[in-house]
Amino acid sequence: MEKMENIKNNKINEIKDIENLRLTSGKIINKNVHQIGIIALGSYLENHGTVLPIDTDIKIASYIALNVAIQTGAKFLGCVLPSTEYEYVKHGIHNTPNEVVEYIDFLVEQGKKIGINKFLIINCHGGNTLINELIEELPYKSDIKLKIKNITSTHASTEELSVGYVIGIADKSKLKEHNPKDYPEIAMIGLTEARKNNKYIDNEAKIAEKKGITINEDLGNKILKNAINECILEVELLLNNK
């Protein structure tokens, strides 16, 4: 009983300590934005043809997440290291959905210790959508609010190359070698099992086959601007308990 009382008192003191901080300082949209944490989710180990690095997804997610944190004042909590993928998408090195959720759970628990009770996960890897149902089953859903914003595009195709170019991770000099005949993961054109099992993947592959793959800086800027603005809106909704 005494131990429980001490824990309760420590929690009260922690809250008071946070309240003593200058929560209105700096460029923020609202002092309550300090209760919101931004987490980047992507993938670290996937081939992306010749133009983009193997950790493209997490770098794009981190870029968006950090910019949202800077523009709103929300806290950037870092990256989820594991990622997952559909069984029929045979490329990259991934983890189980449960391992991804366990890492998110760790970040949430640590975030709660610094006064965060609302979390926005910005995901830039399609395979990670497998965690959606598991997230809903987390036991602390009554204590916190957690939202996932999925921002994905055709794998290693024009949109992703263009975004990668804008943030500085694409090597444009390698575009001529960026060929799906040599690198089947590009637009998943050569991933037969994935195309057979997922009509959306197959449709995206067909579009890339028809239109070709290039780098468009204007397109990259537009995609990034829209993604950041959409995530800022999510932060504003969290501020309004929506």
UniProtKB/Swiss-Prot annotation:
Pathway of action: Cofactor biosynthesis; coenzyme F420 biosynthesis; Cofactor biosynthesis; riboflavin biosynthesis
Catalytic activity entry: 2-amino-5-formylamino-6-(5-phospho-D-ribosylamino)pyrimidin-4(3H)-one + H2O = 2,5-diamino-6-(1-D-ribosylamino)pyrimidin-4(3H)-one 5'-phosphate + formate + H(+)
Cofactor requirements of the protein: Fe(2+); Zn(2+)
Residue numbers binding Fe cation 1: 46, 57, 125
Keyword entries, A-Z: Hydrolase, Iron, Metal-binding, Zinc
EC numbers: 3.5.1.102
GO BP term (any one): F420-0 metabolic process
Binding site for Fe cation 2: 48, 57
Cofactor binding note: Requires one Fe(2+) ion for activity.
Subunit structure: Homodimer.
Entry function: Catalyzes the hydrolysis of the formamide of 2-amino-5-formylamino-6-ribosylamino-4(3H)-pyrimidinone 5'-monophosphate (FAPy) to form 2,5-diamino-6-ribosylamino-4(3H)-pyrimidinone 5'-phosphate (APy).
Protein name (database record): 2-amino-5-formylamino-6-ribosylaminopyrimidin-4(3H)-one 5'-monophosphate deformylase
Source organism (scientific name): Methanococcus aeolicus (strain ATCC BAA-1280 / DSM 17508 / OCM 812 / Nankai-3)
Gene: arfB
